[in-house]
């Protein structure tokens, strides 16, 4: 766990916020990584060993895209390979496939993508390019529709409920009694985060005998930062909500704006967001860069074909693989300690602490001590 947290911190400190411009369908940025991982602008046609195709965001989003790209860069830097990233010109399957085509034309041995929106594109591209290895983070087998992952595809999902549980438990143990969960869309990863958060908060409340813990729970219906979300969060904070777990990419920007305006706090998601938002007390994180590096290393060591560890299957990573957690070194807890965290983490790893991983939006987690207000 300490290795994972150190990795997250190092990656966070190393990332720059240089934007990638360009609006052509073949936009690509190259990183020659024999000795450095500094990106330099390039046109499609440059040599590519490993490609990263972004989702609707960019590589400076301080979230999923940025840390996934960091994983690609780290891997290529360590192995004297060339990395390119490709940004679709619009949010469509056709645009995503077009950038995959560009990556293959540039010589990519492997293409990395992140997010469930890539399901249809992966389902088509894996058959179109059987010699290219596709690594898809946060894409489940179900996201591929009626297609199954082929031997050249590795799907990685995460046990978000474990990270959410740790965040909920720590917040309540630390003394917060009025909590909120702001989800983007009610997709499996977001639901698991939220349900884990509820379970953790309930467990802590029961342990410390707090019968007055409340959670407001709401899905905004999208991942964009909007005035609607900010207004909703303004209402929560002004009504007494102390901290909100904001789970849904850019939607956290609206939550942070409301938190700042009302003196509230926020829990970040996916990556350590303490450097991005002063309101963040902790973050429920995934080991994005680390899992990218491990999967690509697996393919490279097997002649650029995934081994049976990843090939044609969905691999779920959690505490046992050091791929979810809280960045305790940057967390702003006053009561919840590193020792408590380590003990709880070990209990999750060895199975002593079991956390419900269901993600049915219509079936809420059972609670014994807290009150949850599910809002629509």
Where are these regions (language model features)?
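Positively charged n-region of N-terminal signal peptides that target proteins for export
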Residues: 1-8
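C-terminal motif of bacterial Sec signal peptides marking the signal peptidase cleavage site
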Residues: 16-19
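A residue-level marker of the well-folded mature domains of exported/periplasmic proteins
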Residues: 27-29, 34-376
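Universal eukaryotic N-terminal targeting presequences
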Residues: 1, 25-28
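Bacterial signal peptide processing site
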Residues: 21-23
């Amino acid at each position: 766990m300490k290795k994972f947290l150190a990795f997250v911190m190092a990656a966070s400190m190393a990332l720059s916020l240089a934007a990638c411009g360009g609006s052509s369908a073949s936009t690509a940025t190259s990183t020659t990584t024999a000795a450095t991982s500094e990106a330099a602008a390039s046109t499609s046609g440059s040599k590519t060993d490993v490609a990263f195709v972004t989702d609707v965001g960019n590589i400076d989003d301080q979230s999923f895209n940025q840390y996934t790209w960091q994983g690609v860069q780290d891997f290529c830097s360590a192995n004297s390979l060339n990395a390119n990233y490709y940004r679709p010109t619009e949010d469509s399957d056709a645009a995503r496939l077009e950038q995959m085509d560009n990556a293959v034309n540039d010589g990519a041995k492997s293409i990395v993508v992140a997010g469930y929106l890539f399901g249809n594109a992966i389902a088509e591209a894996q058959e179109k390019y059987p010699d290219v290895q596709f690594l898809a983070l946060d894409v489940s087998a179900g996201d591929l529709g009626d297609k199954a992952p082929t031997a050249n595809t590795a799907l990685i999902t995460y046990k978000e409920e474990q990270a959410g549980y740790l965040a909920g438990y720590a917040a309540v143990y630390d003394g917060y009694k009025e909590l909120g969960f702001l989800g983007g869309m009610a997709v499996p990863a977001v639901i698991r985060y939220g349900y884990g958060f509820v379970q953790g908060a309930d467990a802590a409340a029961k342990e410390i005998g707090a019968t007055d813990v409340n959670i407001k729970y709401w899905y905004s219906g999208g991942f964009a930062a909007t005035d609607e979300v900010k207004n909703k969060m303004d209402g929560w904070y002004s009504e007494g909500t102390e901290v909100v777990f904001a789970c849904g990419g850019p939607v956290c920007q609206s939550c942070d704006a409301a938190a700042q305006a009302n003196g509230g706090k926020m829990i970040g998601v996916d990556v350590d967001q303490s450097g991005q938002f002063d309101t963040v007390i902790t973050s429920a994180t995934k080991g994005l860069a680390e899992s990218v590096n491990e999967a690509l290393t697996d393919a490279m060591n097997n002649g650029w074909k995934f081994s049976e560890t990843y090939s044609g299957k969905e691999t779920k990573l959690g505490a046992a693989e050091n791929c979810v957690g809280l960045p305790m070194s940057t967390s702003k807890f006053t009561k919840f300690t590193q020792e408590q965290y380590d003990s709880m983490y070990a209990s999750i790893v060895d199975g002593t602490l079991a956390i419900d991983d269901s993600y049915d939006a219509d079936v809420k987690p059972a609670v014994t001590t807290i009150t949850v207000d599910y809002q629509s």
